[in-house]
From Swiss-Prot:
Subunit architecture: The glycine cleavage system is composed of four proteins: P, T, L and H.
Role according to the record: The glycine cleavage system catalyzes the degradation of glycine. The P protein binds the alpha-amino group of glycine through its pyridoxal phosphate cofactor; CO(2) is released and the remaining methylamine moiety is then transferred to the lipoamide cofactor of the H protein.
N6-(pyridoxal phosphate)lysine found at: 703
Cofactor: pyridoxal 5'-phosphate
Pfam families listed in its UniProt record: GcvP2_C (PF21478), GDC-P (PF02347)
Gene: gcvP
Lineage: Bacteria, Pseudomonadati, Pseudomonadota, Alphaproteobacteria, Hyphomicrobiales
A single GO BP: glycine decarboxylation via glycine cleavage system
Record-level Gene Ontology MF annotations: glycine binding; glycine dehydrogenase (decarboxylating) activity; pyridoxal phosphate binding
Protein name stated in the entry: Glycine dehydrogenase (decarboxylating)
Species whose genome carries this gene: Nitrobacter hamburgensis (strain DSM 10229 / NCIMB 13809 / X14)
This enzyme's EC code(s): 1.4.4.2
Length: 958
């Protein structure tokens, strides 16, 4: 790889919004002589890195987009996308081109944020509602969430739910010996810090002897076996335990649902519904539960409510369950999930409909049955009589020989430890592939000849007898024209980065450049099975190695793990590393975690999951950690102090001056420093956590390193650690050697959502060290510019001793609420009329707005946002002056819709134009919100989380 000869990288100039002329004007506005001078005022000198960011290999200036894509092609060429019949929870699938082009590759979908503002999120909320409906129908359960991270972590979440819901007081959980190995590994990791015991065995034989609060049963099993689980579930429930069934969605189109079998909870992966394997992810997992458990569900739930006119409107329901509300009382830290992938899987079901899904399943099963018949002729009868798509055969000492023959034909089989081979078929399996497998076992058969006499392998008494996907949405869009228009209609309802800036504080909604997204769907990256032989993924390993080194250079840490597939999972993995370190030193009693009151909600939730006791540290009037309170609590808990979790710069939008002192205090009492990297966009190239006292951090690649938010996922949260914690990074059964790791797996795949690492990799590749540093400087400039412009109208709550903010700022309208009744919610909804997504509301300070503009937004867009906020302040002044009451004001009626402007009557004290086209907005390019203000309380009182079946429509018609 060689750098460009030009003095400046073209891509960095395109990524960074303000031009040089804009930067000069903005510096004048904020009263700084230069970017360097502003950085000296915003950052404490004690944390500044001594040398410019050096990424090595001539990458100071980065590559051009053309050169970067050529380099990515060279990496892709080192991968080998063999036909993988490994199974183990991952399947080949066909992503319909219309969905790939119009969702996966469409910035209207992939640049959106989590739909906390429902009025501007109706499109993806409907798509997620469809996902939940699909899951409820296929699993036969009442309520589903809007995705989890992967199947293994979904099972771990189900275990936690079962423990919380069960009346049984034991701390043991039963694990079916047929669960996937990666699931067992993640369960072990999750159970150990909480003091839970795993009991592994055959549920049909061993459950009656087990005293457990719940059990997970794989359906079909990892070996492919299809078992009637009803006796085991009945035994479990008679003893007060909860039944978790980990189910294959495609199999459920032909098999009796978990609900019919008696399950309380169903979990699994939606990967084979159109999402490429991607060497491990990202994929949407799912969880569905009986109605009585709905308030214990982790993650997001989309519900149906009404808007201000009584029209149906979607929203996120039951949010008081979630980690950002429950904090240290949470049993799950799920934050970012896999929304974009859930949308793709739901559209796959819309595309195929129930008949199409069943036909795919029947074809897969028929080819599996035919394969089994041929193997039986060869003397390799499958070990299980009943199967859906996976066979396990005993091959004795011929395992390597047969697997080697398969490899020579470009086919991966699953090599098991007990002299067996696993063969899993999928949507991509052709008769020719089946014939090739037979050849590896020593004979050539004609597929047609064998198929004509092959018996089916599905048990008749487990056949599906209940309907699914009966709602019209799964029947009305069968032509590409109709489906294309449906997806376009939904995307038009939403406001994403392709329309306007999204100034969400602590979320870093920056540009996800098109070039960064291109390699993602290349077959050489998308088509690899995560457990394929390492030699087939040399391009991936080269990417991992180089990207890890870049993160080491950026952070000052000594080792990196790419496994955590969300920021919250990164927190969890980092705390497990600290826990493992203390245990290895004989300090297992160190379980106290100090957390400032301003912390992200995931911090206390992650600490709770890691078996730690949360002790809250106060913040002072400036928003900084109260160092005196920290010192007192560190001393009070010195014998048991495990760690502090601190976000830097703080969630108050300021670089705290005493961060080194904070680290020193914790270290002096035997604790470790976990520095939350959510705000790393303010540090890259300027300061390195590993240099000023932190021991471990996670990095949100979906923030700082340009993976798009996808409407609520995917994300990645790799962790960096200092050398003394390196041996406590997450392990994985697919990559561990003979010696078990000190800390187990936290994700289903060894490198998490590996395929989207290509996005962050190419971003760094094109930005180079200079570009990344410049991006950080401009992000800080943009935040200070917004703070300067808005402060006369909405006071900026926190600044450092030199009057500067970091990369975000908090504005405080609470006095206006006290005087006029205008709430932060009113301001947020009124911003929609101006064409903007609201800033972060009421975090970390209730009643305030936190704004993060990022480096990607131009001065023109920043000015448009500031002008909108100032115009809203003038509207509030009308209320102050008594010309409007707050109830009759455009703020309380916001957002305004086409129904407002088209209404035959208008009795409000402001004009239609004032309401619908407020000052400075364009009538030509107006974003029309599809619904009025959504009634959140109504939605929780009248919870509806899936589409009603067709018989409900028929009954309503009667």
């Amino acid at each position: 790889m060689t750098a460009r000869e030009e003095p400046a990288t073209t891509f960095a100039r395109r990524h960074i919004g303000p031009s040089s002329r804009d930067i000069a004007a903005m510096l004048e506005t904020v009263g700084a002589k230069s970017l360097a001078a502003l950085m000296n005022e915003a950052l404490p000198p004690s944390i500044r890195q001594a040398a410019p960011l050096d990424l090595g290999q001539g990458l100071s200036e980065g590559l051009s987009e053309t050169e970067a894509l050529a380099h990515m092609q060279s990496l892709a060429a080192q991968n080998q996308a063999f036909t993988s019949l490994i199974g183990q929870g991952y399947s080949g699938t066909i992503l319909p081109a219309v969905i790939q082009r119009n969702i996966l590759e469409n910035p209207a979908w992939y640049t959106a944020y989590t739909p906390y503002q429902p009025e501007i999120s109706q499109g993806r909320l409907e798509a997620l509602f469809n996902f939940q409906t699909m899951i409820c129908d296929l699993t036969g359960l009442d309520v589903a969430n809007a995705s989890l991270l992967d199947e293994a972590t979904a099972v771990a979440e189900a275990m936690a739910l079962a423990e919380r819901a069960s009346s049984v007081k034991t701390k043991a959980f039963f694990v079916d010996h047929e669960v996937h190995p990666q699931t067992l590994a993640v369960l072990r990791t999750r159970a150990e810090p909480l003091g839970w015991t795993l009991v592994t065995g055959d549920p049909l034989r061993d459950l009656d002897k087990a005293d457990v609060f719940g059990a997970v049963l794989q359906y079909p099993g990892t070996s492919g076996v299809v078992r009637d689980l009803r006796p085991a579930i009945s035994t479990l429930k008679a003893k007060g335990g909860l039944a978790v069934v980990a189910a294959d969605l495609l199999a459920l189109t032909l098999l009796a649902s978990p609900g019919v079998l008696g399950a309380d909870i169903a979990v699994g992966s939606a990967q084979r519904f159109g999402v490429p394997m991607g060497y491990g992810g990202p994929h949407a997992a799912y969880m569905a539960v009986r109605d009585t458990l709905k308030r214990l569900l982790p993650g997001r739930i989309v519900g149906l409510s009404v808007d201000s006119r009584g029209a149906p409107a979607y929203r996120l329901a039951l949010q008081t369950r979630e980690q950002h509300i429950r904090r240290e009382k949470a049993t799950s830290n799920i934050c970012t999930a896999q929304v974009l992938l859930a949308v793709i899987s739901s559209m796959y079901a819309v595309y195929h409909g129930p008949e199409g899904l069943a036909q795919i399943a029947r074809t897969v099963h028929r080819r599996t049955a035919t394969l089994a018949a041929g193997l039986t002729r060869l003397g390799f009868a499958p070990l299980n009589d009943a199967a859906f798509d996976t066979l396990t055969v005993s091959v004795g000492d011929r395992q390597n020989e047969i697997a080697g023959r398969a490899l020579s034909q470009g086919i991966n089989l699953r090599i098991n430890a007990d002299h067996t081979l696993g063969i899993a078929l999928d949507e991509l399996t052709t008769p020719e592939i089946v014939e090739a497998v037979w050849r590896t076992f020593g004979a050539a058969f004609s597929y047609a000849d064998v198929e004509a006499h092959a018996p089916d392998l599905l048990p008749a008494d487990l056949g599906r007898r209940t309907a699914y996907l009966t709602h019209p949405v799964f029947h009305a869009h069968r032509s590409e024209t109709e489906l294309l228009r449906y997806m376009r209609k939904l995307s038009d309802r939403d406001l994403a980065l392709d329309r306007a800036m999204i100034p969400l504080g602590s979320c870093t909604m920056k540009l996800n450049a098109t070039t960064e997204m291109i390699p993602l769907t290349w077959p050489a990256f998308a088509g690899l099975h995560p457990f394929a032989p390492c030699e087939q993924a040399e391009g991936y390993y080269a990417l991992f190695e180089e990207f890890e080194q870049w993160l080491i250079d950026i952070t000052g840490y000594d080792a990196i793990s790419l496994q955590p597939n969300s920021g919250a999972q990164g927190e969890y993995a980092g705390l497990l590393a600290i826990r493992g370190y203390h245990a290895a030193r004989g300090d297992s009693h160190r379980t106290v975690c100090l957390i400032p009151s301003s912390a992200h909600g995931t911090n206390p939730a992650s600490a709770n999951m890691a078996g730690m006791e949360v002790v809250v540290v106060a913040c002072d009037a400036r928003g900084d950690v109260d160092v005196d309170d920290l010192r007192a609590k560190a001393a009070q808990h010195a014998d048991r102090l495990a760690a502090i979790m601190i976000t830097y710069p703080s969630t108050h939008g300021v670089f705290e001056e005493r961060i080194r002192e904070i680290c020193d205090i914790v270290h002096s009492h035997g604790g470790q420093v976990y520095l939350d990297g959510a705000n790393m966009n303010a540090q890259v190239g300027l300061s390195r956590p590993g240099d000023y006292g932190a021991d471990v951090s996670h990095l949100n690649l979906h923030k700082t390193f340009c993976i798009p938010h996808g409407g609520g996922g995917p994300g990645m949260g790799p962790i960096g650690v200092k050398a003394h914690l390196a041996s406590f990074l997450p392990g994985h059964p697919a990559t561990d050697g003979a010696t078990p790791p000190a800390v187990g797996a936290v994700s289903a795949a060894p490198f998490g959502s590996a395929s989207i690492l290509t996005i962050s990799y190419i971003y760094v590749l094109m930005m180079g060290g200079e570009g990344l540093t410049r991006a950080t400087e401009v992000a800080i400039l943009n935040a200070n510019y917004v703070a300067q412009r808005l402060d006369p109208h909405f006071p900026v709550l926190y600044r450092n001793v030199k009057g500067r903010v970091a990369h975000e700022c908090i504005i405080d309208p609470r006095a206006l609420k006290a005087e006029t009744g205008v709430t932060v919610d009113d301001i947020a909804k009124r911003l929609i009329d101006y064409g903007f997504h609201a800033p972060t509301m009421s975090f970390p300070v209730p009643g305030t707005l936190m704004i993060e503009p990022t480096e990607s937004e131009s001065k023109a867009e920043l000015d448009r946002f500031c002008d909108a906020m100032i115009a809203i302040r003038r509207e509030i002044a009308e209320i102050e002056a008594g010309r409007w009451s707050v109830e009759a004001s455009p703020l309380r009626h916001a957002p305004h819709t086409v129904h407002d402007i088209a209404d035959d009557t208008w009795s409000r004290p402001y004009s239609r134009a004032q309401g619908c086209f407020p000052a400075g907005t364009s009538r030509l390019d107006k974003y029309w919100c599809p619904v009025g203000r959504v009634d959140n309380a109504y939605g929780d009182r009248n919870l509806v989380c899936s589409c009603p079946p067709m018989e409900d429509y028929a009954q309503a018609a009667e």
